[in-house]
Amino acid sequence: MITREFDTIAAISTPLGEGAIGIVRLSGTDSFAIAQKIFKGKDLNKVASHTLNYGHIIDPLTGKVMDEVMVGAMKSPKTFTREDIIEINTHGGIAVTNEILQLAIREGARLAEPGEFTKRAFLNGRVDLTQAEAVMDIIRAKTDKAMNIAVKQLDGSLSDLINNTRQEILNTLAQVEVNIDYPEYDDVEEATTAVVREKTMEFEQLLTKLLRTARRGKILREGISTAIIGRPNVGKSSLLNNLLREDKAIVTDIAGTTRDVIEEYVNINGVPLKLIDTAGIRETDDIVEQIGVERSKKALKEADLVLLVLNASEPLTAQDRQLLEISQETNRIILLNKTDLPETIETSELPEDVIRISVLKNQNIDKIEERINNLFFENAGLVEQDATYLSNARHISLIEKAVESLQAVNQGLELGMPVDLLQVDLTRTWEILGEITGDAAPDELITQLFSQFCLGK
């Protein structure tokens, strides 16, 4: 594999702030030369690749010792970027890592753009686009199941499936071309309408099956957006805090104290549940509270799941009935809170099974998790250990386009169109799938994707 010629880049690869270790990473042809200028220890040009080397970082202009470090020296092509890589392991801290980064830049490196290390890995053929995106998914994963899907994608499970399908499509196209250009050849199977239809239906079934994993994959990657709704002071914020096991929302006896939308994540059965505690939906003259109410209504419309909290110790109010009405078309769980008090709510007016809870006494909170599990996971068979999942919106959109293109081929065959006229749609399918792996992705898309990465990755 021939790597492209790039300048040498540098960035801090660890989160900013205090920590045990901070890492300044360099990648490029001059990585070793730049590091050698500021490192006092072994000659990095002579050490074995993939070794850690003890020494000190020295400012060559002043002779000042900046820090005691371990320098990782990795020579191309067996590195993440397929370039020479230096990783300076410093004591963690904003000042020391920044000063060492500035030294590297002063001696000839350029400050890396967000995601530029991974972008170089892609451009140099170390990873394809799906694997590069998986790197960010691993960083952002909130549960073990989300991380497992990202790791499988990084290992190439999706890439292999897409590449194998593209190769089969290419073989079919080649067969059609040979039949058109060299009809006298008997060694090649004739690309009849029946043969092409069988192949395209096979491709369509494969991609459709992959699309069926999208809902589960998206849930695992992004979580279930869950709006906690109810009139003011029924215990929404207390429920949020109970589920999170920590105080995040303002909990008082004063109606209207949650004036905005509060978002937090909780792990339910290995799946991230994005809990959105909304301001109580009611008529109010308070401008700030009005904004919170409008945001609550928006969160309700966009939620995958609605937890409607009612006060079991009070009769249903007009606001309760309004919330029951506007949430009836959603995935909804009705919670009767404050069951530690005498129950006066009219349960006969409630349209479905409810869960009786007492947030104050921590009663039946586990039943909420059980119901969520039944709603989303149990019947769907959430995770198959060896399955390949679609979870990325870009991938899902492109697979949908590829399926549409294959359907156009099959519709054309049913109408009796000649096979050679349908090459355009079959070729388009091949190109669309190439956008997923990056083989046919435009430069603008690649730049936009990597710009979403963090610095130093």
UniProtKB/Swiss-Prot annotation:
Gene Ontology annotations of biological process type: tRNA methylation; tRNA wobble uridine modification
Keywords in alphabetical order: Cytoplasm, GTP-binding, Hydrolase, Magnesium, Metal-binding, Nucleotide-binding, Potassium, tRNA processing
Predominant cellular place of this UniProt entry's protein: cytoplasm
Positions contributing to Mg(2+) binding: S237, T258
Cofactor section: K(+)
Compartments in which it is found: Cytoplasm
Chain positions recorded as GTP binding sites: 233-238, 252-258, 277-280
Cystines in this chain: none
Cofactor info, note text: Binds 1 potassium ion per subunit.
Residue ranges of every copy of the TrmE-type G domain listed in the record: 223-377
Top-level division of the source organism's lineage: Bacteria
UniProt: (6S)-5-formyl-5,6,7,8-tetrahydrofolate binding residues: R25, E87, R126, K457
Enzyme Commission number(s) of this protein: 3.6.-.-
InterPro entries linked: G_TrmE (IPR031168), GTP-bd (IPR006073), GTP-bd_TrmE_N (IPR018948), GTPase_MnmE (IPR004520), MnmE_dom2 (IPR027368), MnmE_helical (IPR025867), P-loop_NTPase (IPR027417), Small_GTP-bd (IPR005225)
Transmembrane segments: none
GO molecular function terms attached to this record: GTP binding; GTPase activity; metal ion binding
The protein's role, per its UniProt record: Exhibits a very high intrinsic GTPase hydrolysis rate. Involved in the addition of a carboxymethylaminomethyl (cmnm) group at the wobble position (U34) of certain tRNAs, forming tRNA-cmnm(5)s(2)U34.
Subunit structure: Homodimer. Heterotetramer of two MnmE and two MnmG subunits.
Similarity comment text for this entry: Belongs to the TRAFAC class TrmE-Era-EngA-EngB-Septin-like GTPase superfamily. TrmE GTPase family.
Record protein name field: tRNA modification GTPase MnmE
Gene name of this polypeptide: mnmE
